[in-house]
Amino acid sequence: MKLDEIARLAGVSRTTASYVINGKAKQYRVSDKTVEKVMAVVREHNYHPNAVAAGLRAGRTRSIGLVIPDLENTSYTRIANYLERQARQRGYQLLIACSEDQPDNEMRCIEHLLQRQVDAIIVSTSLPPEHPFYQRWANDPFPIVALDRALDREHFTSVVGADQDDAEMLAEELRKFPAETVLYLGALPELSVSFLREQGFRTAWKDDPREVHFLYANSYEREAAAQLFEKWLETHPMPQALFTTSFALLQGVMDVTLRRDGKLPSDLAIATFGDNELLDFLQCPVLAVAQRHRDVAERVLEIVLASLDEPRKPKPGLTRIKRNLYRRGVLSRS
């Protein structure tokens, strides 16, 4: 089936059908009703654009690179899943690479994707803000879009969580619990995302007289958090309140506590970035903030596709998407 037939069956012009199928409906203000008419015909007839032919005409490969720091992080994998599905619907292939939160790995991943001649790259960077690696593309038309962790906003477009605001909101909720000892567990303080989450926490806690212990793991991996927390427990009692800046860090704490005590204390108040419905089975109060994965993926892909459309190339800058707050553990049953 050809594009002309899709347009005829949907009752729209060939140009409008092309905008919808190639992900440019919003750019050209095609109504949601028209988009649904076209996509209904596409689904009914299992239509797939000829990506090779389109790529040859446009000098493109119809492929997009994605570099994420951790394939075991469910937040990243959910975003990747939405990105892949939406990109495929628009005739693009998503090539996924993992940096393991190592700067050298990330730079190699980027170089390999460039060798594959991808049309654009989406990256959640593990590089500190002052690192010069991405500056070579600062004035280059090649689209690089930052996901979750921002790049230089003067030259790149970034879609991130509202890290500082989300951390402040989460810490404000945690403050309501009558805990005497508080532990803040983060990782990689040199990353902007880590800095912003700590700033949000400190803002919420600035007028609270309770002492907070700050710990930073050398990675956002579960094992790194477990090792750090286990060593900390050698000289400190179990905290009564815990704030973790990622779900993997919380898992590391839980691993150590369950191995040592067989269960989590019922009076341990937990606040964490990242969410999982299984937290509802815990017998302690849990506060969790989670990204709106579909919204993040849609916005990122919208920016990527707009970046490939020269007349409508978006300006550099930062888009923040606030997370949702969930009450888990015993809070889900009250």
From Swiss-Prot:
Cleavable signal peptide: none
Keywords of the record: Activator, DNA-binding, Repressor, Transcription, Transcription regulation
Top-level taxonomic group: Bacteria
Pfam families (alphabetical): LacI, Peripla_BP_1
SUPFAM superfamilies to which the protein is assigned, alphabetical: lambda repressor-like DNA-binding domains, Periplasmic binding protein-like I
DNA-binding region range list: 3-22
The keyword DNA-binding belongs to this UniProt entry's keyword annotation: yes
CDD domains: HTH_LacI (cd01392), PBP1_FruR (cd06274)
Description of activity control: Is displaced from DNA by low concentrations of fructose-1-phosphate.
Entry keyword annotation includes Lyase: no
Function according to Swiss-Prot or TrEMBL: Global transcriptional regulator, which plays an important role in the regulation of carbon metabolism. Activates transcription of genes encoding biosynthetic and oxidative enzymes (involved in Krebs cycle, glyoxylate shunt and gluconeogenesis, such as ppsA and fbp). Represses genes involved in sugar catabolism, such as fruB, pfkA, pykF and adhE. Binds asymmetrically to the two half-sites of its operator.
Assembly and interaction partners: Homotetramer.
Name the UniProt record assigns to this protein: Catabolite repressor/activator
Native source organism of the sequence: Escherichia coli (strain K12)
Lineage: Bacteria, Pseudomonadati, Pseudomonadota, Gammaproteobacteria, Enterobacterales
